[in-house]
């Protein structure tokens, strides 16, 4: 069953990662297509205007050739510019000489003025191919320009007529033609396209973020589910063990009471210095020890019913240290604790916490033997938890001992039951906390447990 469950969980995790990867890949491809299409649309719109400008320039050159054939020259060119300026989207036409002086303009009032300085014309690198640039003044425009060549082209009859033109016409200075197109509609389309692209990219980003969050929450759900399954299995085992322990305890405690009673009876009726008296006392002590083992076993397997209340850990630690102060003083062991006045109060069972601390103190006292230090510290972690640590200067533990320290019935003491730290771990976990230990031979031991500020019994969470 566990193998099948593990296999199903592994398949679910693998599919979740595969689905997440596919969604992220599709979102990236979709975003790339959006950006590419946006660039293509802008380039297509600009290319359309440029082709329109090229057609108008060739038409103007053709009309000018006809005018030359009919000996109309500049008047015909001016008339053509004024007529063609009425084309949709055209702001103005202009033909200049190589120095930027206007020869013809769609606005006849500007003829003879300077359109651009000669230095600007040189910077434009004007040639036989159409070029373009954006203008912002006096209004947004796309300007297309190239050399104006009305003498080139035409059929055989036109070329024969051009040969008969005067020498000054054929050898005239280079001219440049400019066409300015209104780009307000183009800019509006560009802005709409940009806005749509941003909206689509934001939507893609939301999908990507939602996918990542879904994966995060799914992984969190998987972890919570696994923890719940483990807690349920552990609880079922503890319940079964509890029933067994309760039955065993009932069967053991009754004869133990009889044995202890008989041991005391014989101890009272035998000489104090006799062997029988000593044997009777040993029997009584062993009966007490066995009864204590049974009690600790029941406490370990019985679900804890915590009585939550607002607890000041400073007070709990101080009171628990007072309970072991005489035993520690008799062994020349100093107890160190600095209260934290700003420490927040937590929701916990104070009696159970004292039981945890007393178990840790007594283990530390036993590990030290004589002359040493037990240091207790408490602080807030900043993540909704409080950290409590108990350190001693005892003989420490090996790595093997440290690994088994919370295992029931494992003890480093000859007379220990091996249930103390198991009970400690159980109480801490019932509070929704965790506990761990650090130690090395000759370097003492450090036990640290974390408790949630707003405690809730672990079984209730499940």
From Swiss-Prot:
Keywords annotated in UniProt: ATP-binding, Cell inner membrane, Cell membrane, Kinase, Membrane, Nucleotide-binding, Phosphoprotein, Stress response, Transferase, Transmembrane, Transmembrane helix, Two-component regulatory system, Zinc
Residues bearing PTM Phosphohistidine: 250
GO MF annotation list: ATP binding; phosphorelay sensor kinase activity
CDD domains: HisKA
Entry comment on modification after translation: Autophosphorylated.
Membrane-related topology note: Multi-pass membrane protein
Reactions the enzyme catalyzes: ATP + protein L-histidine = ADP + protein N-phospho-L-histidine
Annotated source species: Klebsiella oxytoca
Database matches in NCBIfam families: PRK10364.1 (NF007688)
Name listed for the protein in its UniProt record: Sensor histidine kinase ZraS
